[in-house]
């Protein structure tokens, strides 16, 4: 089997809901990003065999946003492209599929990633096509319906976090402390330019000016335990999950360029990291936030590794409650986890986050001179996905 290398790992800065990226299409966000990723390693777009992109909120984007991204990035129309929807795991599953295609010899070079513009996600009505004789039309929100609602229990993802908090006795104060730590780490990372190598700037044209968007705008550097404590529970009257200790609704994209180790050597490209292994699992949808636990255990077992063998972890912070439970159940050293902050601070553009955690992990390993890293996400509906990468 071909050993698969990452030769470029880039992401956009993450936009707030209704923020800088709200009027920029997913196809443009992704296309601009992929173009810059290719340029960063002077890779001829003609050499790319396939483009695989995660995306969850597809309503209104037009046919196959991955194909649109590829064309916008200057990749020839003769090349293949397709979209992956594994909810929050979409962006990482796209990488898994790219790796597999290279390992079996179907492709030499693949661009994989994820994109989401949650701000641009439309509302819709189900009953308009054949008419409604009486009564009003009801609009539904695609963000809530297709991105944030459990299809089996018909309740918000926040309730799954409440379920975990109750099951593992994770109190509100613990969740707020975890959220504050994420904010502080992210703010410090931005202050120290730790994201400079991974962020590709997006130029946004308005009527009056051009704006370069290159700093994560969702981070709340001035957060405090006092301000977090004032927030009301979001999903349950006497609950513990709030807007402050949950991830945001956000816009952004991330991508990696994959190729075999042999191809990288032929092209004279530096390898950032190698993909060592990956695993996906399912579990009870009512506690979907625990998904990283079995997925991580599975990939470590496949690779004959222990948790102590991993130098850095990027665990997607859907909610503080599930993040705390995951770190406890896996017995993670918190000094190794989300060292630049996580989704509670940076944001969670759902189709992009799977690749975003990978991109951040790759650059953290390089900057911190560490060898092995693991990234993982919980997935709405009751799944988990994990991946291990190494620099050697």
Language model segments and positions:
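Active-site-proximal alpha-helical scaffold in enzymes
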Residues: 86-116, 165-194, 255-262, 349-370, ...
């Amino acid at each position: 089997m071909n050993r698969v290398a990452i030769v470029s790992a880039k992401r956009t800065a993450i936009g707030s809901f209704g923020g800088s990226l709200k009027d920029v299409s997913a196809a443009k966000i992704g296309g601009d990003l992929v173009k810059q990723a290719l340029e960063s390693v002077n890779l001829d777009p003609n050499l790319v065999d396939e483009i695989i992109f995660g995306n969850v909120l597809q309503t209104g984007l037009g046919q196959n946003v991955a194909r649109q991204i590829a064309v916008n990035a200057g990749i020839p129309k003769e090349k293949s492209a397709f979209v992956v929807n594994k909810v929050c795991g979409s962006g990482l599953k796209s990488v898994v599929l790219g790796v597999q295609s290279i390992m079996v010899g179907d492709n030499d070079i693949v661009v994989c990633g994820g994109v989401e513009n949650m701000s641009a996600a439309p509302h819709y009505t189900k009953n308009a096509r054949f008419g409604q004789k009486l009564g009003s039309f009801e609009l539904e929100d695609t963000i809530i319906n297709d991105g944030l609602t459990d299809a089996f229990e018909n309740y918000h993802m926040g309730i799954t976090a409440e379920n975990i908090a109750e099951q593992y006795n994770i109190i509100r104060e613990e969740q707020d402390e975890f959220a504050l730590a994420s904010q502080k780490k992210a703010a410090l990372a931005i202050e120290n330019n730790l994201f400079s190598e991974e962020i590709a700037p997006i130029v946004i044209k308005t009527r009056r000016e051009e704006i370069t968007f290159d700093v994560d705008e969702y981070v709340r550097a001035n957060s405090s335990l006092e301000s977090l404590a004032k927030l009301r529970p979001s999903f349950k009257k006497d609950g513990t999950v709030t807007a402050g200790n949950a991830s945001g609704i956000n816009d952004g994209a991330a991508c990696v360029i994959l190729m075999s180790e042999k191809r990288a050597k032929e092209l004279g490209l530096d390898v950032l990291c190698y993909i060592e292994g990956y695993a996906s699992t399912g579990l009870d949808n009512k506690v979907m936030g625990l998904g990283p636990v079995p997925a991580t255990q599975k990939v470590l077992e496949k690779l004959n590794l222990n948790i102590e063998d991993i130098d850095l972890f990027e665990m997607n912070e859907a909610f503080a409650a599930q993040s705390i439970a995951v770190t406890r159940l896996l017995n993670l050293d918190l000094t190794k986890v989300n060292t630049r902050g996580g989704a509670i601070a940076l944001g969670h553009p759902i189709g992009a986050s799977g690749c975003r955690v990978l991109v951040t992990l790759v650059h953290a390993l390089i900057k911190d001179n560490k060898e092995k890293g693991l990234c993982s996400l919980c997935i709405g509906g009751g799944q988990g996905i994990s991946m291990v990468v190494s620099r050697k």
